[in-house]
């Protein structure tokens, strides 16, 4: 049954507890596409170097699907390449990577080889080049890539069950170079001509020198204790740490972080698993700067801040398999993040998920805030803008979200701004537009936060009002009813007119959020007008 769920980009993520079966946190679902025969398997991403369009590539039971995810409101399949053995019961999964404008797909089914797909004709279509079989090659469990080289992992025994290097100097006709077969390799990652191989059945991780592609050599290996069953690896951007996922073995099957700065003494740093969950299986991890993006089977997609390697902090998640958390191999298989910050994940049963982490802004509206309850009387919609940090401060991106009355947090989605420093501006329907005290660092490939409430200096020119002393909180000024960037007699006139007419409902003149225009709204606005409150911006 074909099922495509598209969610508008301004959809607000539901905030719940740390247990993923109870909800999702700090991730917005943009689309869930499930229109192929299950089970689904691995996925990868491809960004067109010419036009910047983004594509998800996801393995299905009967082939590989190519999905354009560029426009959050129009996510759709643009191509499909059938399996070399469709319907074969041994062909339940496939893995893929990209190089230049080509995708390379492998599977464990016999005689599957490497499927080569030309992506240069996107967004119109994909072009299937051929199935490539090197001498002695039949099947491969997983595939990795760095530069113009593929690394085939866990291929058929006669070809190389460890790691085999394929040269892509001619992308449509790979050439076998060297191999390393001391142990079976389930998966690997390659960084700076160094292979980090997961030897799942030998409970170890091997670090292999691949500077000479014709002659791979072991640098060192270590036992991935405790409860070892290393499925895949990832390496931090500074190459100082190795992240390892334990798919098999005793529980907990968790993420492990190892310090590899001294290759003669690789040391265990810490283990991590989702808060409150010990019964799900970790599968794949990818690293992006100071973040680890994890496919955690029935616990779904998890984003973990690994800035402090000794204390990883989970900052966002989306549970693709909310019905249970068990030791079954269901749920999320693979994950990938684009430079835009879009996250894709594959669920074995429900297909492709496209997500985006939110930019969480904590703020309070003066008129709506109750200092006795330390909450706002109600939530309300706020617009947020990212403006360039230098004159003329052009708008780079914008979003809208609802402030939660209890947490005072609004969760925004930005899709256009690149990584950089921006002024953050918040604008409410009858409050004064407020700029951040300084440009804020925005990283689309991470989780971003800003708190206006904890210091007056968080607003440019200290342009906020003290609204609570315990806890100390500051709020944006209320009363700019006509949105002319100052609070003055013209705003008072509008409120007075509505109050005289006993106006009620969701109206601009309702400054305190009680759905009535009356004396209390006039009082708030009059105080700010008396103090000549106006916008302060660079």
Which residues are covered by each model-predicted region?
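Alpha-helical segments with a strong preference for the paired helices of cellulosomal dockerin domains
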Residues: 351, 459-470, 481-508, 512-538
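Short amphipathic, basic-aromatic surface patches that mediate peripheral association
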Residues: 359-377
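Bacterial Sec-dependent N-terminal signal peptides
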Residues: 1-23, 359-362
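Structured interaction patches on ligand/partner-binding surfaces of diverse proteins
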Residues: 402-403, 431-467
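Short Pro-Gly-centered beta-turn/loop motif in secreted/extracellular proteins
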Residues: 407-422, 430
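Short coil-to-beta strand junction motifs in C2/discoidin
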Residues: 59, 374-382, 419
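Feature marking well-ordered beta-strand scaffolds used for ligand recognition
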Residues: 19-358
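Short, acidic Ser/Thr/Gly-rich low-complexity loop/linker segments typical of extracellular
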Residues: 390-408
């Amino acid at each position: 049954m074909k099922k495509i769920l598209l969610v508008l980009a301004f959809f607000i993520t539901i905030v719940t507890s740390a247990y993923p079966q109870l909800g999702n946190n700090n991730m917005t679902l943009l689309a869930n596409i499930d229109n192929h025969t299950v089970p689904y398997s691995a996925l990868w991403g491809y960004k067109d170097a010419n036009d910047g369009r983004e594509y998800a590539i996801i393995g299905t039971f009967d082939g590989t699907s190519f999905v354009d995810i560029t426009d959050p409101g129009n996510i759709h399949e643009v191509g499909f390449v059938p399996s070399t053995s469709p319907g074969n019961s041994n062909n339940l999964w496939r893995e893929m990577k990209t190089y230049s404008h080509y995708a390379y797909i492998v599977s464990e089914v016999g005689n599957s080889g490497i499927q080569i797909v030309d992506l240069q004709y996107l967004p119109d279509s994909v072009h299937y080049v051929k199935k490539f079989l090197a001498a002695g090659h039949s099947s491969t469990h997983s595939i990795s890539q760095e530069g113009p080289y593929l690394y085939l992992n866990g291929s058929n025994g006669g070809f190389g069950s460890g790691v085999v290097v394929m040269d892509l100097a001619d992308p449509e006709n790979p050439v076998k170079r060297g191999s390393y077969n001391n142990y079976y390799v389930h998966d690997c990652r390659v960084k700076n001509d160094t292979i980090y191989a997961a030897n799942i059945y030998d409970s170890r991780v091997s670090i292999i020198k691949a500077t000479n592609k014709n002659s791979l050599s072991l640098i060192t290996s270590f036992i991935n204790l405790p409860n070892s069953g290393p499925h895949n690896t990832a390496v931090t951007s500074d190459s100082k740490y190795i992240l390892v996922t334990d798919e098999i073995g005793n529980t907990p099957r968790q993420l492990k972080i190892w310090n590899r700065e001294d290759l003669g003494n690789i040391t265990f740093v810490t283990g991590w698993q989702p808060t409150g969950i010990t019964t799900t299986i970790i599968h794949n991890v990818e690293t992006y700067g100071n973040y680890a993006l994890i496919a955690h089977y029935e616990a779904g997609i998890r984003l973990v801040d690994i800035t402090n390697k000794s204390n990883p902090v989970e900052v966002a998640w989306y549970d693709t398999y909310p019905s249970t958390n068990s030791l079954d191999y269901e749920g999320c298989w693979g994950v990938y993040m684009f430079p835009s910050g879009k996250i894709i994940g594959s669920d074995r049963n429900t297909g492709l998920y496209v997500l985006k982490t939110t930019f969480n802004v904590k703020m309070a509206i003066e008129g709506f805030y109750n200092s006795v309850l330390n909450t706002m009387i109600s939530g309300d919609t706020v617009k947020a803008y990212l403006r360039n940090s230098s004159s003329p401060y052009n708008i780079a991106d914008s979003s809208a979200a609802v402030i939660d009355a209890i947490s005072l947090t609004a969760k925004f989605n930005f899709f256009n701004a690149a990584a950089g420093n921006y002024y953050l501006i918040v604008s409410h329907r009858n409050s004064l537009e407020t700029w951040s005290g300084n440009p804020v660092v925005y990283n689309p490939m991470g989780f971003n936060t800003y708190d206006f409430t904890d210091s007056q200096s968080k607003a440019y020119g200290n342009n906020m009002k003290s609204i609570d002393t315990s806890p100390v909180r500051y709020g944006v000024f209320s009363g700019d009813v006509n949105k002319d960037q100052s609070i003055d007699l013209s705003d008072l006139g509008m409120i007075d007119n509505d109050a005289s007419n006993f106006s009620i409902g969701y109206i601009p003149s309702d400054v305190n959020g009680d759905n009535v225009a009356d004396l209390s709204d006039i009082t708030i606005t009059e105080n700010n007008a008396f103090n000549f409150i106006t916008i302060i911006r660079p």
